[in-house]
């Protein structure tokens, strides 16, 4: 039920306005194997479940600890986000980007 038929990869919480060309390369069986080629369109929510995985509409994530920013930009939580007080396991980025050393929630 994802934005580009990649529900297993998280998809998009909202709508994918720009249309996702190739979607997630690799089929998204158990997560995006090689990541997505590039970000697509405009997404309202993007989620990255593990390092190297990205949703069908979110730019590739690296070093994520549970979530991407809720804006279509390349910025993900770092593993040190647990000390930011933004929540652990569910991603520390709720509305803004997570910096390399601290969250900007």
From Swiss-Prot:
Signal peptide: none
Region (14 X 2 AA repeats of CG): 4-87
Coiled coil location: none
Domain of life where this protein originates: Eukaryota
Keywords of this entry: Keratin, Repeat
The family this protein is said to belong to: Belongs to the KRTAP type 28 family.
Biological function: In the hair cortex, hair keratin intermediate filaments are embedded in an interfilamentous matrix, consisting of hair keratin-associated proteins (KRTAP), which are essential for the formation of a rigid and resistant hair shaft through their extensive disulfide bond cross-linking with abundant cysteine residues of hair keratins. The matrix proteins include the high-sulfur and high-glycine-tyrosine keratins.
Further comment: Human have a similar number of genes as other primates despite the relative hairlessness of humans.
UniProt name for this protein: Small cysteine and glycine repeat-containing protein 4
Native source species: Homo sapiens
Phylogenetic lineage: Eukaryota, Metazoa, Chordata, Craniata, Vertebrata
